[in-house]
């Protein structure tokens, strides 16, 4: 009966907006843990290379690093069961490696230049998940900060990075939100607050059953006079768009890159008794100028909505600013009277086309063959 209900619920939600969703109990914890700042596991990033688990990265401070695992180790056995040679599903492997805190998993490892398997008993524990991936002085006096998500620990990581960069002599900042699909709104609001004086509108929410709610800066920011640039792309979404929109509409800095994703729906999480969760859309996010961040959609037409990024690519939007169609009916003004446009997502002040000089198909084939890891 439970499975019947779980099979029927997605049909119900398909008639709602594209982001209202039901998450089964078995997936709910995983859906939330990336934003919580840590999870219980062994602390490795891995990939399936042909039919073997290849450790790509060992998370600093995690259980695997403490046990002695290294990048490019190959996991052959897990708890004495063979996982090499049978093309195991990546999701199954992940669930096997994760588990209750303080439980132990035995790994059989093949390491370069070691003739025999090495065995490690790894005690699962809290694995830190960083959301500020990197921060450094990119040029004299200019600090660069890459924020990959807006999680529970993001703001603290961010102000720590700012403090270190200031100590190194940085007086202006580049905030990189490319590929940042969002997270907690509060983290984005707190970050915006660092760059603005008191009384500036950051964002407001409004819905049919929810009256307008404005969020303002409180004047406690430590970088109120520091020049700032924000980097965005088509995968910058949700909280990334709140941050970018607030900076742009308040004329606090420049947005450089490409139009953002266009996800601006306020969702209310509803925890169900069996551990499953409903995320129900209740309102929309608006930038200070009044732009709705959410791109347009039609109820019940999720497939068209999901094709939006592909259609933007096909129309040349990632390669040429001229391919972006600006609608004068969606024209708004910043605090200083600059024109900005709505219609979904945040339009950059300076357009940068996608990088087409990256990885070649030949290089991809070499990596997939395993030749670089011999």
How does the language model describe each region?
Residues 72-74:
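Structural motif
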Residues 292-293, 297-374:
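Conserved functional hotspot residues or short segments at active or partner-binding sites
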Residues 1, 24, 54-57, 63-70, ...:
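Cleft-lining beta-strand/loop regions that shape enzyme active-site pockets
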Residues 2, 21, 112-117, 361-374:
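Peptidyl-prolyl cis-trans isomerase
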Residues 78-79, 110, 296, 343:
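Residue-level recognition of conserved beta-strand edge/terminus positions
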Residues 239, 251, 258, 262-330:
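Polar, glycine-rich mid-to-C-terminal structural blocks
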Residues 7, 19-57:
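PDZ/PDZ-like peptide-tail recognition elements
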Residues 1-21:
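N-terminal activation segment of mature serine protease catalytic domains
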């Amino acid at each position: 009966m439970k499975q019947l209900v779980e099979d029927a619920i997605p049909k119900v939600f398909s008639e709602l907006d594209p982001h209202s969703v039901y998450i089964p109990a078995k997936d709910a914890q995983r859906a939330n843990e990336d934003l919580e700042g840590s999870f219980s596991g062994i602390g490795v990033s891995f990939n399936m290379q042909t039919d073997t688990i290849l450790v790509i990265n060992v998370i600093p401070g995690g259980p695997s690093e403490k046990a002695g695992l290294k990048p490019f180790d190959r996991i052959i056995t897990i708890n004495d069961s063979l996982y090499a040679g049978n093309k195991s599903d990546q999701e199954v492997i992940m669930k096997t490696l994760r588990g209750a805190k303080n439980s132990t998993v035995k790994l059989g490892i093949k390491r370069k230049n070691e003739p025999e398997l090495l065995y490690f008993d790894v005690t699962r524990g809290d694995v830190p998940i960083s959301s500020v991936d990197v921060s450094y002085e990119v040029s004299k006096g200019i600090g660069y900060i890459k924020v990959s998500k807006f999680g529970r620990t993001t703001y603290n990581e961010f102000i720590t990075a700012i403090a270190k960069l200031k100590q190194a002599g940085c007086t202006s900042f580049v905030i990189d939100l490319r590929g940042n699909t969002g997270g907690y709104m509060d983290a984005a609001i707190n970050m915006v607050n660092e760059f603005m004086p008191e009384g500036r509108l950051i964002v407001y929410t409004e819905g049919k059953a929810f009256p307008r709610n404005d969020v303002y800066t409180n004047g406690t920011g430590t970088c109120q006079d520091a020049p700032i640039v924000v980097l965005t792309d088509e995968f910058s979404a949700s909280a990334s768009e709140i941050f970018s929109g607030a900076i742009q509409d308040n004329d606090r800095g420049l947005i450089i890159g490409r139009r953002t994703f266009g996800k601006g729906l306020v969702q209310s999480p509803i925890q169900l008794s069996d551990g499953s969760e409903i995320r129900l859309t209740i309102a929309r996010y608006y930038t200070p100028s009044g732009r709705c961040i959410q791109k347009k959609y039609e109820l019940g037409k999720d497939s068209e909505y999901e094709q939006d990024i592909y259609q933007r690519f096909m129309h040349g939007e990632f390669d040429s600013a001229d391919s972006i169609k600006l609608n004068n009916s969606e024209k708004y003004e910043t605090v200083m009277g600059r024109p900005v446009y709505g219609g979904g997502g945040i339009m950059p002040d300076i357009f940068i086309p996608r990088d087409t000089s990256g990885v070649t198909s030949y290089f991809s084939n070499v990596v997939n063959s395993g030749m670089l890891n011999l």
